[in-house]
Amino acid sequence: MHVTLPDGKQLDLQAGATALDVARALGPRLAQDALAALVNGELMDLMTPLPEGAQVRLITKKNPGDAAPVFRHSLGHVLSQAVGEFYQRKGYPREAVKRGVGPAIENGFYQDFDLPEPLKEEDLPEIEAIMREIIGRGLDIVRQDVGKAAALKHFSYDPYKVELIQELPENEPVTFYAQGDYVDLCRGPHFPNTGKLPGAFKLMSTSGAYWRGNEKNPILQRVYGVAFATQKELDEYLERLEEARRRDHRKLGRELELFLIDPLVGKGLPMWLPNGTVLREELTRFLREQQFQRDYQGVVTPNIGNLDLFRTSGHYPYYSDSQFEPLSVDEEQYMLKPMNCPFHIRIYASKPRSYRDLPVRLAEFGTVYRYEMSGELNGLTRVRGFTQDDAHIFARPDQLKKEFLDVLDLTVLVLKTFGMNDVRFRVGVRDPASDKYVGDPAQWEVAERQIIEAVEEVGLPYTVEPGDAAFYGPKLDFVVKDVLGREWQLGTIQVDYNLPERFDLTYTGEDGQEHRPVMIHRAPFGSLERFVGILIEHYGGDFPFWLAPRQIMLIPIADRHNAYAQTLANEFKAAGLRAEVDDSNNRMNAKVRNAELHKIPVMLIVGDQEEARREVSVRERTPEGHKERKGVDFTALLAELQERYRTRA
């Protein structure tokens, strides 16, 4: 067999040769330094036989980061071995520790266990120390191919491995990887030796996880770790993680009294507290203003609908796994609304439409319900009941590009208004090899071309992702990077040829004939809950003045200044601003500290001098730090803050 190197050179090797054989053919030093290989663009370990004609690039200790998924996978095996040794040192037999799966994941690895007694967080440092012992032993990591019967016999004590092995094809070898006396069922890839694994790793946490993600299965204990090629990368990651903890929307949501999730109300069903309600209403007011300027029409639809509506749309039964069970009322079946679009379609269809009427733009802040497994729920970002800023545009095919551009412009405006300036687009188009798509291929080609043209006109970076389109039409996802460098998919625009067909939507064309409209789904926020959760973390709770639930805190120096402070607060309120007075018995410094803890952007201190001159002393929270101004005329400040609120500066 032969393989091709990055410089185009070809090597002739024996059949069944591995990447390690390639390294040996190029020299003993390279064989010593090699860690993994990129084979036909995919990561592979040094022990796996190469395919004929493969293109091979060796990864060495000079660039270990290129093999991060491989060393993270191997560290997962080291973790698994270390947990086994941890329990053996406690007197348990080797077979007492049973194992689920343990893949490499972004930034690290995890391993699932069925343990004789639960691991505690305080056990993790000891297990990490055992991992470092195993790395220090310099154990060769060896690939082994065995028959299915032998594999079942080896793991007869472990029901999880037995289940996985039984699902494998009968006549194919089962792959094990061994290091020392530890053996695991695994396809690889792995580093060649534990001694070559980086020491820049850390065990982070332990939690419960259902076997194979199914709530009907046993709960296993999952241990998470992170790993990087260098200590510098690990330290930087841990710093970012600490900053993320400080910004965690669940923590800040409690501290700033924004939302509440009460177990008696139900998991994944957030309630908005007064401060959070202000935040939510500012978001909806902003978007309603933008939609009004773009000729959207507001609608309101029920929270439940007849099951036949969702049968017609196809949401039931095709998406029934992510929906709540139907309920029976008066011999009819109803379902909690999983999506707003079928309701908007029925509004469109409620009267005849002419080509002159189109486009019809229907918008709603509509609450929908999706069944999420309890293990996937997370604060506001993964919930069971949420409100979408949903709109559906019914347009003629010749209007598609213009409407798409307008929605694109609106969504970019929304994101940039909230300081999310690092935006890229992901255009989802058909996979030419798939037959899952509905609609006329010629229409698809026009729609895909017009979406790409629209994106290019905006001038932001984009990628085209074949196969990422929905079955009913191409789509555009907005991917935003926040201040922590994390990427979020916020907002989607989807072109839909399917639902107009299913509901037999028409309009009368200029030729007097009935024609099928094209439909656009759009939601710039996606959902208010998720968007607010991301906003809280993006701003770290330090919202801009116009968005802050509590905008102004007046701080009297002494009790005799309370009346003056209240007079000013009333004038702020009359001007539409949110102001309050801290008339507690605390000292002034304590009042300032309390306002700081609640991240109130504007603090106004008033004493004898300020009252005599109708002035205030201003202390502001800004992204650059605190900004202080003494003796500011109140009337001028009121006008300044009104303008900031009006312009959302």
Curated annotation (Swiss-Prot):
Residues 248-544 are annotated as: Catalytic. Keywords: Aminoacyl-tRNA synthetase, ATP-binding, Cytoplasm, Ligase, Metal-binding, Nucleotide-binding, Protein biosynthesis, RNA-binding, tRNA-binding, Zinc. It is an enzyme of class 6 (ligase). Pfam families: HGTP_anticodon, TGS, tRNA-synt_2b, tRNA_SAD. Zn(2+) binds at C341, H392, H521. It comes from the Bacteria. SMART domains: tRNA_SAD. Its cofactor is Zn(2+). Its EC number is 6.1.1.3. It catalyses: tRNA(Thr) + L-threonine + ATP = L-threonyl-tRNA(Thr) + AMP + diphosphate + H(+). It is found in: Cytoplasm. Residues 1-60 form the TGS domain. Its main location: cytoplasm. GO terms for cellular component: cytoplasm. InterPro entries: aa-tRNA-synt_IIb, aa-tRNA-synth_II, aa-tRNA-synth_II/BPL/LPL, Anticodon-bd, Anticodon-bd_dom_sf, Beta-grasp_dom_sf, TGS, TGS-like. The keyword Transcription does not apply. GO terms for biological process: threonyl-tRNA aminoacylation. GO terms for molecular function: ATP binding; metal ion binding; threonine-tRNA ligase activity; tRNA binding. Catalyzes the attachment of threonine to tRNA(Thr) in a two-step reaction: L-threonine is first activated by ATP to form Thr-AMP and then transferred to the acceptor end of tRNA(Thr). Also edits incorrectly charged L-seryl-tRNA(Thr). Belongs to the class-II aminoacyl-tRNA synthetase family. Homodimer. This is Threonine--tRNA ligase.
